[in-house]
Amino acid sequence: MDSGITPHMPMTRDLLFDLGGVIVDIRRENCVEAFRRLGFADIADYLGDYGQRGVFLALEQGAVSPEQWRAQVRRHLPAGVTDGQIDDVFNAFITGIPLERLQALRRLRAEGYRTFVISNTNPVMWHGPILRAFAAEGRDINAYFDGVVTSFEAGCCKPDERIFRLCIERFGLDPAATTFFDDSEANCRAAAAMGFRTIHVPPSSSFLDFI
């Protein structure tokens, strides 16, 4: 999508980032294969490239707790599978964050941009591999962002306008002065409809290619 953005982003004050596929590297196939090895044969029906289904979506929306999610996942698995095994195969979705992206986020803040996250994610990944990935430089996520909104605490997922509205209200965003980065075209369209400047980050790219 055409954002009108230049390398120095003169008309942009705030930057709103998706995580997976934009900052955090993800590999759906790692997760699918790991679940299949554990015995969840039809896992691909629940995990999409840009959204989840069934109890996985419910976890992402905060409608079920991690404990309730694991209990429902166990219905698809052989007896004896532990909580740790379930979490480990699910977390295989996340492969890490290249250090240059973390460094770029700190540089953007040092240059005066406010940086924010709006992410469709779940508490299992968030409190596990995602926050660990942000600790790679010995800092925590607050070193990189001025604020975070996750779908599981918002109770809704992109492209629902409610999660964008929550970001606007919580952080005092002016959509016309905010550039939104996402790997989902549907999410970019939803943000553009609310007045945000948008950049679609295609597969095998990152936000670094657009700043």
Question: Can you annotate each of these PLM segments?
Answer:
Residues 114-116, 197:
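Proline-centered loop/turn at the N-terminus of a beta-strand
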Residues 109-110, 192:
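Anion (oxyanion) recognition and catalysis
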Residues 8-103, 110-111, 122:
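N-terminal helical cap/lid subdomain that shapes the substrate entry/recognition surface
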Residues 33, 103-106, 166, 189:
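Surface-exposed charge patches
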Residues 119:
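Conserved phosphate-coupling serine/threonine residues in phosphotransfer and NTP-handling enzymes
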Residues 106-109, 172:
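N-terminal cationic-hydrophobic initiation segments that often serve targeting/anchoring roles
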Residues 111-112, 144:
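Structured helix-beta-strand junction loops
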Residues 2-17, 122-123, 127-211:
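Asp-based, Mg2+/Mn2+-dependent phosphohydrolase catalytic module
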